[in-house]
Amino acid sequence: MKPSQRLYVATALDQDGPVALDTGQAHYLAHVLRLPVGAAVLLFNGRDGEWLAHLTQVGKKGAEAVCVEQTRAQTPVCDLDLLFAPVKGDRTDTIVEKATELGVARIRPVLTERTIVRKLNLERLRSRAAEASEQCGTLFVPEVFDAVSLMSPLDPKAEPRLILFADEAGDAMSVAEALADKPARVALLTGPEGGFTPAEREKLRASPLVRPVNLGPRILRADTATFAGLTLIQSTWGDWT
């Protein structure tokens, strides 16, 4: 039977290995999809590739599966980070979901002077990332970190990484120009509703780790800028090329 569901699990996956599914997954399989024992599912954990598995238990007491064969080997993750200022409503959730679909490895919220949303539900955001990975077919789930100050990624002690700063004001190069030297590690930085303050822009532009980039002739909403920037990076430098 062709698998109808793809699930992210935290446990190791190997031939004939049993896998216990969490209570949410068990409920979904049993009561929403109504899958019987023996039904096929696909499992992945971000380390061991993707596996075809058969359900050996599904019901009120939970769900378990056993791995039958590997369907895809694990592939390297594009070393791309997203640094973004959280936004109001459910748009932060959407940013996490779409960034996952667009292939980022790590999602790092940053707090700017104009950031309105300063407390995040990390459990929910990590769940959104896992669900997006299940749906889009990727073999990994990006890490979602707690929010840090805007200037934390510029700390000399931090891992060196080229940061493309989506600058809505002032002179800035294209994404293709910024990535012409093919850096090993890249991050996209997008701002809050209302944009960065002049002081923040000045500090960012002064850093040797930062290259200001423009995302076209129109002013974009904070979430739209994130999607546009990641798309340009992936098509120019990332795993779309």
Residue ranges and their predicted role:
Residues 198-241:
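Structured adenosyl-cofactor binding patch, chiefly the S-adenosyl-L-methionine
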Residues 157, 163-203, 209-214:
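Active-site/ligand-binding-proximal alpha/beta "capping" segment
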Residues 1-72, 123:
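N-terminal positively charged helical leader segments and presequences
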Residues 6, 18, 40, 62-64, ...:
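Structural motif
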Residues 70-165:
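RNA substrate-binding interface of SAM-dependent RNA methyltransferases
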Residues 40, 91, 193-197, 218, ...:
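Gly/Ser/Thr-rich beta-alpha loop segments that engage phosphate groups in nucleotides
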